[in-house]
Amino acid sequence: QPTGVMENGGARILKVKTLNIQKTNIVEKGIGTLLLESQYLHAINKYWRDVKFDLILYSTPPITFNKVIRTLKKRWNAKTYLMLKDIFPQNAVDLGMFSKKSFLYRMFRSKEEKLYELSDFIGCMSPANCEYVLKHNPAIDAAKVEICPNSVKLQERLKGDRKEGELLKELNIPASKRIFIY
């Protein structure tokens, strides 16, 4: 599909055409990952130049969005939240894809450090990941690192626990506002 804005359920979604970066060979994945940043910046500038966001959520992989995050954070004076799914490039070293002495490692490690610096908050998948990130990145303020798991165990609740709208009122969320759960 070409790059463009689509409507779905009342939400405007910017779809960006990219190279294949999943389930492909390492060369295509590498080139595609490096091109993502410029493809997203171009699409955002073309389709959402006048749109303002208060919060920018982004996840890893990829870690190659530094310029996108820096540009948008400055343009909108937005808060940024990194959802850290993979600790890259260390996981590539662990998988034997390249060594810590390689040019690729140094390049991606530099991008990783800059992404952490740009992020107002960093959500890690587990307490162990939080510890790892802080141990290997002493420049990060521990106050901005927290646990943000992919899922949580659901608690059984009785259907009649709360009256409709009670939680929204409790959280000071206007009932007329659209609510997104990510």
Language-model segment annotations:
Residues 1-47:
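A conserved catalytic-core segment of Leloir-type glycosyltransferases
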Residues 29-45, 53-78, 82-91:
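An aromatic- and histidine-rich active-site surface loop
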